[in-house]
Amino acid sequence: MDNDRYDILIAEIRKLNTALERLAGPAPIESDWTSADCFVWAPGRLYLQPVPKPNRVALTLIRGVDRVRDILHENTQRFAEGFPANNVLLWGARGMGKSSLVKAVHEDVRAASGVSLKLVEVHREDISTLPVLLDLVRDTPHRVIVFCDDLSFDHDDTAY
């Protein structure tokens, strides 16, 4: 093969490589699980963004939801210990403390158990990427709680 044909072949291979990389999308960025206990899912970069100082309140400050708090705490404790746990749906009006309760229970169980329990928040608009997120966290040695804040189902919403 002469040099001209060789150069043309190399150029075509490079074009193919560029097209394949574009189709494949971005490679996942390795998440540093040791950097935080709380993360936010960034699906565009296939990355768990650490939240080093999450906005949360102490569990003892949450009042008026004792039964729900106790059930959620027991379920989270079982999950942290490696036992099966139930999925949870907390519902109520905005501002009632649902997310605060989730974050407070996470911190209380994590601190008391010493288990590497991580909390990952998924934004409502990123729910469709849950399978990708679950693939990324499946092989981690950590116990991972995934939660979506302010999930709502509107009459005209066809995304669900």
Residue ranges, per PLM feature:
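AAA+/P-loop NTPase substrate/partner-engagement loops
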Residues: 108-144, 151-156
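Helical mechanochemical/support elements of P-loop NTPase systems and associated helical scaffolds
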Residues: 68-71, 101, 126-130, 156-159
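Phosphate-binding P-loop
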Residues: 51-53, 77-85
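Walker A/P-loop nucleotide-binding motif
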Residues: 82-104
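Pre-Walker A adenine-sensing motif
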Residues: 67-81
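Interdomain "pre-motor" coupling segment immediately N-terminal to P-loop NTPase/helicase cores
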Residues: 2-50
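Dynamic helix-loop-helix/coil hinge segments at AAA+ ATPase domain boundaries and subdomain interfaces
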Residues: 7, 47-71
